[in-house]
Amino acid sequence: MKSLKITALSLVLVLLLAACGAKNDTPDEPAVDPTPEPPIEQPVEKTPDERINDIIAGMSIEEKVGQLFFVRCPETGAVEDVETYHLGGLLLFGRDYKDANGDWLTEDDFTAALASYQDAAAIPLFIGSDEEGGTVTRASKNPNLFSEPLPSPQELYAAGGLDGLLERTLSYNQKLKAFGVNVNFAPVCDVSTNPDNFIYARSFGQDAQTTADYISSVVPVYAQSGVACVLKHFPGYGNNADTHTGIALDARPYTTFEKSDLVPFESGIAAGAPFVLVSHNIVECMDGAYPASLSAKVHTLLRDTLGFTGVIVTDDLAMDAVKAYAQDGCAAVLAIQAGNDMIVTTDYQTQIPQVIAAVQSGEIAESDIDAHVFRVLHEKQALGLID
């Protein structure tokens, strides 16, 4: 019996040893590394130009063409027309600072009106005003907005020198910005020293270089205020007639423009001015066949010779000088073909469909429209209106 127990115990020990041996003979399984997490792709931030191109790619022809119109604010229906015509900008005149009864708008009412226009726009608007000072003022005539109308540059310069002029320009434009105005159709770059000239009272009243020095100093002041400025009236009025009432022929030689009229524009462009407005003068040494606003040659001069890369805008196409010239009523089509980026006009309800039709027919290439829209949106981006 004792022998059986010993035998059984020995068998158990043998089995245990065999099991241990079997376990030790099994090779170790290799360690498995944890599956690495896929790298998180960081979104590539697009450049400002790429963001603009994305916007343009998503726009219809109607939306693109609408962006090229900086129209006189209609007396009624402005909110509806901003949405219907996809307008790029509204230009305010004296009546737009008054209510339906002819009373001056309060600050709150004026600010609310501009905000309502912006609310109607899929792409934020340029909202412009002519606030040159002196004989051409809009906003500052409203005593609810400003304590006094803005004096002319000549008056401000005579009273306080260049520093005084720049200080007043800054303060007035900062107020415009606070109300919702983001483009001022100023300063006047025309060179005029003759009080009998049409443009004299609106000009700086000094020679070309002194005017150029003023322009190069005042352009950064507009930028500081957050309001874009508009150099006007390219290529310079000189002693010409008023194109609001008819065609003005300028027979001066090109050397005169080189030494005088173009000098302030060159200074303003070098200082970073975002807009240049082209006049309706027929400048024979540049293009004797077309008003400057409708002349491809004048626009080539502005782009290629003066190196301007910003927004070119027409003077008001409702002026008699262009009405008489564009007898078929397609002034906006001619203006865009000439190289303008934006059209200032009152009859946009007629002109916009004509431009759309010209694009659809191939008379105006859509690629040209895209280039104009790009410059418009680039400036809206610079003003912080779009990302």
Where does each model-flagged region fall?
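Preference for extracellular/luminal or secreted protein segments
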Residues: 21-81, 305, 324-387
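Phosphate/pyrophosphate-binding betaalpha-module
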Residues: 214-233, 260-273
